Every structure is written in C-alpha cells, then in structure tokens.
Amino acid sequence: MQLTVLASAILALAQGALAIPAKAPALDVTLSQIDNTRVKAVVKNTGAEEVTFVHLNFFRDAAPVKKVSLFRNATEVPFNGIKLRFRNKGLTDDVLTTLAAGATFEDEFDIASTADLTEGGVVTVRSQGVVPLTKDNKVSGYIPFTSNEIELEVDGAKAAAVPAAINLLDRRTKVASCSGSRATALQTALRNTVSLANAAASAAESGSSSRFSEYFKTTSSATRSTVAARLRAVAREAGSTSSGKTTYYCGDPYGYCDPNVLAYTLPSKNIVANCDIYYSDLPALARSCHAQDQATTTLHEFTHAPGVYSPGTDDLGYGYQAATALSTSDALNNADTYALFANAVNLNC
C-alpha cells in the first residue's frame, strides 16, 4: 500500500447500531430498460407503514455506487465504481429517503458508466440486499429489497460512448505523502488494523465457535479458513506502507466525500480514500461493541479491494443487525461483517 494525500474540503459524520422492526417492511424494485445501457428503477414501499432509510449505496445516490449486479453468461461483470462507508448516526437529511406505505420513487442511471460493456451482447441485470432504516437520523434497523431480473441486448459501440463515472485523470491536487495530524492518525489506524486483523484471523481459525457463528452463520473449518485468510491479507496490506497492492489517500481524490461518508474504495484500481469525518468523527479504536472507528473502517475498506484478497467484498448488510442476518455466503462477501467481527474479537463482545 502506498500512502498519498490530497487537498479535500468536505464537512462532518459519525456512527451507530441496528434493530429489526416489529413488522418488517420491504422494498420492491422494478427494473426496466430505457435505452441500451440506461436503466430505470422504481422503488416501492410494500409495507404497511412509512419508512425512512439511508439511500447512500442505493438507488437515488448520485455517486457511482453499485446499484445493480450485472452478469454475462452467469459470470458477474466487474464493477468500476466506488464502495463507500458512511457514518451510522448524525446522518444529514439529504441522504435519507422517506416513503409512505405504497409510495414509490424512481432513479435512472447508465450501467455502462460503472462497468465495461463494450463487448456488447446479452447482459442480465438484478439487485437485492438490505438498506439501513433510520430514526432520529441514526441507523436503527434495516429493510430488505429485491428486484426483478431483466436481460438487455447491449450495443457495445453505444456502451463504449458512455463516459466512465470516474476518470482517473480527474484527481485533485496530489501531495507526495501524508503529513501532519492526518499522517499520524492514519499511521496509528494502520498499526491498529494490523493488530485487529491478525487477532480476528486467529479467532476465526481457532477462537470461539459461537462468536464466529454469530457473524458467519457456520462453524465449518473451510469457512473459518477463508475468513482468516482474508483478514491476514488485510493485516499484511495495512503493514506495508511503501509497497503492497493498494494506494491509500489521506484525502478525497475524486470528490465523493459528502458530509456522511467516512471513506470509500475504488475496487477496480485498488484505491482507498479517507474523508474528513474519518479524522474528525471516529476514535482510533472503539470502546463499545458494534461501534465504528478508524481501524475497523480501514479494515472494512481493505476487504473491498481485490488486490488485497480476491474477490473483493460488497456492502450487503450495514451494521450489526443487518450483517448478522446474512447467510454464510453473503457474510463472506460483506465488508462490514469483517469489521464487526474484528471489533467483537478486540472487545470480547
């Protein structure tokens, strides 16, 4: 990993936990093709009550996040956008969506802006997962969503004409290395990440089976070995500040740090970037179970990077309640599950 910093100017953020509602609502997503690679999503609250949820990493997010999964011949097409981690308390109103029972909203986006579809041909599009519910601007639960599946006959030439959402030449001012208080904070976070990831790897291999099952829903030796391998890879990456597979920015190179985003990863380039509130809102290490901190945020982001351990993780369940409700296969592919497990091992939760 190579450390880099750039000038950034964004505002403030924080953290939290989850609790499933008594009568769990759900969101239904209807996908349709507008033209070639341009897609419309209609999101409907199918529950009996009004819900408010975070739409970061979801439909309505203006950033190039993963809203749908794309498949060609049953193989997933690599995603070229960003995966971000946001605070789970103190959320600003502009990243929250409120839907009355039966209400809908629409979102239109071009899937070719975050995936290479220049080959053309048939592409299958679908989406499912959970999004965080909120109360008083704090994550308080989660709501599942699922979509229909559509097949698109993609014109490769037209797809090639769609501008990429992220242009690597558009980076802001880049300074040679981290400096000052941010350099100190990040170096501390990286050292803590090494310790947390190694301890969590050992716990995955031979620690409490009940704790492992709490997060990964199995005690199989194969799964424990897989989790340990990813965590040890994270520890190696965090310990290599002048080499390694990732480039780590102390600031925001692409302008995706809004006032609620702690950090983000560009998996296609193995780039990790911290946002202002990573430094202002997070402690170096959490003192309570399931809380966010700098070290587990860095750990979370490293699991997204396929250069650290392939394949990189997604964001399938955010926060303790959502993450521990996932199946084994989804937990293995969920960044927050690794961060939460490391926190639990560190604090003996």
From Swiss-Prot:
Metal-binding listed as a keyword: yes
Disulfide bonds: C178-C250, C257-C275
Cofactor annotation: Zn(2+)
Binding site for Zn(2+): H300, H304, D315
Catalytic reaction(s) noted: Preferential cleavage of bonds with hydrophobic residues in P1'. Also 3-Asn-|-Gln-4 and 8-Gly-|-Ser-9 bonds in insulin B chain
Subcellular location: Secreted
Species of provenance: Aspergillus clavatus (strain ATCC 1007 / CBS 513.65 / DSM 816 / NCTC 3887 / NRRL 1 / QM 1276 / 107)
Protein name, UniProt field: Neutral protease 2 homolog ACLA_052720
Alphabetical UniProt keywords: Cleavage on pair of basic residues, Disulfide bond, Hydrolase, Metal-binding, Metalloprotease, Protease, Secreted, Signal, Zinc, Zymogen
Top-level taxon of origin: Eukaryota
InterPro entries: Fungal_M35_metalloproteases (IPR050414), Lys_MEP (IPR029463), MetalloPept_cat_dom_sf (IPR024079), Peptidase_M35 (IPR001384)
Cofactor remark: Binds 1 zinc ion per subunit.
Record-level GO BP terms: proteolysis
One GO CC term on file: extracellular region
Propeptide residue intervals: 20-172
